[in-house]
């Protein structure tokens, strides 16, 4: 008789990317980013990105931590729209005055120093996070406004007018900024806008993406697509590039977040090879280092600690940001603040060298995601053809120098506006989604990726991976599983996210039960589990019993995927640090499962027709060996890999000769092939 073996993992069925779901892009847009002209006369639509279904113009919005930007594809080109102050980027700030007026943008930021407790910024650093997240707790100590806990999530408490205290979610604050961008576009286009493409950092998790979409709804916008910021910037760089394939690294360092994406651009196909980043690193952190430095200087020179003085800190923050910007073009500046506190004027020089010293570790930290993305993409430094700088913080000379040194002196490409490139790409995406086509466009394809591995738990707590990190999305993958026990009528599908081999070390996203499975021996039912990630990075899971047709489906919502950037980094870091431990544990589980499967299959044989062909002594011998093995398994749940393998060999030494002899006596009928192989279609992991 053949040796029964543990059911192997079923072949993953890659159903492929549906071309209809892929994003078609223009290959040549006339001109570069155009300055917004004065609003056209009422009723002049201007050939904007119209929906084929009559849904109106679709705009592209870069919702940034510190600044936001809006664009539209119109008259065969992308136009970045200036706000009512004539500026093409708008501060992502919201404030409330004594008279109850709400200010958004420049007006809010300009009065922040005089009204710190009622001026809100950095909502993007709170959105989609948990109140208990380390980043939130750290930021709370630095923000002048009150951040409070509401159902485990951070909210902002602010007095909107005298005596009227309100609590806003980060989604609501972001919605206020989105509303301003929407109104800016409406004033320019002369029509109502209800649809948008909104960008997010590539390393935003599902909860943060869902929360961003919710902010759009609050702002009266249908967010047709969430697009990753570095991918949008790559469109701005490569939309008019033709010729041989190029590997492009997008280095996106903004006010509050940092992303690195590596893309292969080949005649209109934009394929993301890998992405990495830090959703809590950017210009705001560089400003904070300067503030900490000057607080110490003030304490030393004036004997005054302004750390608790929100107004003084507001003035200092404003001047530190100005100094940081100036040092990108000058080697020394002077930070001067009139009447910083108690009528005391402050004046202190700041050199570029000192600025670089204060932020040296943060600048070096940006190289870590670069190295990880390069490794994930499987590329060497010489394989990168272009380095594209995006985000205002990439203007810092030291950041540029570190990147240049890493790539052996290669100069970054400065052909795109770092402040506007993301909104440009979003506007192109909006145009394509709206169905806009003209004589200047050709079909182009964008292939983005999922940032983390997605899978489910199988027998022994093993993380069975269905969608590995950096898999192109949208994607759908199906794998067939089976039951772990006899007459099992319900299976629990537990969905996880992470890089470790055991589910206990990964993040549980959600779980559900598939019931009504027809009672059958262990291993007989076939349950097809399908993971589907849409173009926004949102996951849905379907489980179906092939025999009965019963199915259950869930969409993993933001509530289910409450995962902070710190946890993402921990998952990847621990996966790298404990890879050997993961491998050993997986091998231990595999060895135990192999022994259990062999015991089960021999017991099944003893209960079948082959048992009738056994002689009494043979049957007793096999039954005794199986009983001893079963008892040993029950008494040794934590045995090592070698112990399980040795026990399996001992059992095989007893059972295989008997089964082989019976098989030969029966003329080869009623048994399994001697090599023990079974059809792969019936071989499935157990749930």
From Swiss-Prot:
GO terms under cellular component: cytoplasm; endoplasmic reticulum chaperone complex; endoplasmic reticulum lumen; membrane; nucleus
Q: Which InterPro entries match?
A: ATPase_NBD, BIP_NBD, Heat_shock_70_CS, HSP70_C_sf, HSP70_peptide-bd_sf, Hsp_70_fam
Q: PROSITE patterns, per this entry?
A: ER_TARGET, HSP70_1, HSP70_2, HSP70_3
According to the record, what induces this protein's expression? By dithiothreitol-induced endoplasmic reticulum (ER) stress response. Induced by tunicamycin-induced ER stress response.
**Locations listed in the record:** Endoplasmic reticulum
The record describes the protein's role as: Functions as a chaperone during endoplasmic reticulum (ER) stress response.
Protein name (Swiss-Prot/TrEMBL) = Heat shock 70 kDa protein BIP4
Tell me what organism the protein belongs to. Oryza sativa subsp. japonica
């Amino acid at each position: 008789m053949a040796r029964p073996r543990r059911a192997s993992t079923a072949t993953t069925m890659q159903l492929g990317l549906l071309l209809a779901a892929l994003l078609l892009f223009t290959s040549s847009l006339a001109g570069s980013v155009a300055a917004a002209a004065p609003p056209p006369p009422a009723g002049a639509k201007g050939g904007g990105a119209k929906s084929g279904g009559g849904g109106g113009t679709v705009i592209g919005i870069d919702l940034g931590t510190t600044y936001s930007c809006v664009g539209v594809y119109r008259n065969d080109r992308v136009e970045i729209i200036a706000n009512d102050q004539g500026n093409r980027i708008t501060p992502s700030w919201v404030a409330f005055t004594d008279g109850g007026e709400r200010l958004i943008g420049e007006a809010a930021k300009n009065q922040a120093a005089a009204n710190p407790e009622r001026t809100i910024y950095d909502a993007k650093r709170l959105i989609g996070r948990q109140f208990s997240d380390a980043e939130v707790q750290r930021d709370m100590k630095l923000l002048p406004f009150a951040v409070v806990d509401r159902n485990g999530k951070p909210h902002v408490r602010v007095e909107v007018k005298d005596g009227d205290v309100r609590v806003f979610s980060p989604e609501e604050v972001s919605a206020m900024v989105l509303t301003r961008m929407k109104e800016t576009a409406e004033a320019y286009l002369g029509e109502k806008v209800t649809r948008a493409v909104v960008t997010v950092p590539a390393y935003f998790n599902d909860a943060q993406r869902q929360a961003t979409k919710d902010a759009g709804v609050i702002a009266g916008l249908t967010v047709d697509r969430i697009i990753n910021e570095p991918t949008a910037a790559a469109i701005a760089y490569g939309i008019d590039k033709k010729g041989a394939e190029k590997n492009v690294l997008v280095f996106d360092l903004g006010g509050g977040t940092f992303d690195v994406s590596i893309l292969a651009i080949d005649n209109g196909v934009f394929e993301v090879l890998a992405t990495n980043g830090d959703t809590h690193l950017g210009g705001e952190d560089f400003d904070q280092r300067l503030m900490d430095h000057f607080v110490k200087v003030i304490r030393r020179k004036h004997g005054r600690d302004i750390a608790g003085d929100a107004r003084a800190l507001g003035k200092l923050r404003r001047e530190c940001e100005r100094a940081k910007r100036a040092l990108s073009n000058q080697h020394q500046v002077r930070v001067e603040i009139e009447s910083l506190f108690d009528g005391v004027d402050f004046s202190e020089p700041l050199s570029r060298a000192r600025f670089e010293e204060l932020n040296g570790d943060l600048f070096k930290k940006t190289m870590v995601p670069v190295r990880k993305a390069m490794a994930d993409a499987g590329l060497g430094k010489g394989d990168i053809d272009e380095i594209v700088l995006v985000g205002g913080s990439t203007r810092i000379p030291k950041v540029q120098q570190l990147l240049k040194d890493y790539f052996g002196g290669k100069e970054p490409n400065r052909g795109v506006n770092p402040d506007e490139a993301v909104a440009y790409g979003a506007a192109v995406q909006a145009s394509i989604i709206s169905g806009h086509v003209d004589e200047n466009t050709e079909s182009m394809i964008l292939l983005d990726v999922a940032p983390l591995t997605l899978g489910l738990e199988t027998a022994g707590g093993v993380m069975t991976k269905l969608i590995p990190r950096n898999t192109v999305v949208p994607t759908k993958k199906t794998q067939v599983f089976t039951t772990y026990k006899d007459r099992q009528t319900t299976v629990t599908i537990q969905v996880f996210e992470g890089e470790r081999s055991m589910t206990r070390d990964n993040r549980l996203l959600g779980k559900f039960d598939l019931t009504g499975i027809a009672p059958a021996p262990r291993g007989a039912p076939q349950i097809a589990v399908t993971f589907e990630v849409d173009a926004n990075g949102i996951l849905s899971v379907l489980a179906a019993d092939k025999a009965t047709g019963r199915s259950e489906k869930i969409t993993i919502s933001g509530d289910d995927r409450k995962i902070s950037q710190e946890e993402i980094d921990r998952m990847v870091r621990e996966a790298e640090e404990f890879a050997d431990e993961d491998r050993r544990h997986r091998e231990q589980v595999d060895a135990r499962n192999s022994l259990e499967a062999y015991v089960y299959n021999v017991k099944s044989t003893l209960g079948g027709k082959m048992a009738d062909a056994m002689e009494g002594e043979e049957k007793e011998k096999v039954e005794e060996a199986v009983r001893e093995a079963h008892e040993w398994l029950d008494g040794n749940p934590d045995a090592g890999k070698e112990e399980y393998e040795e026990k399996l060999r001992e059992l095989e030494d007893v059972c295989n000769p008997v089964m082989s002899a019976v098989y030969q006596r029966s003329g080869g009928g009623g048994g399994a092939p001697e090599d023990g192989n079974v059809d792969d279609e019936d071989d499935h992991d157990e749930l």
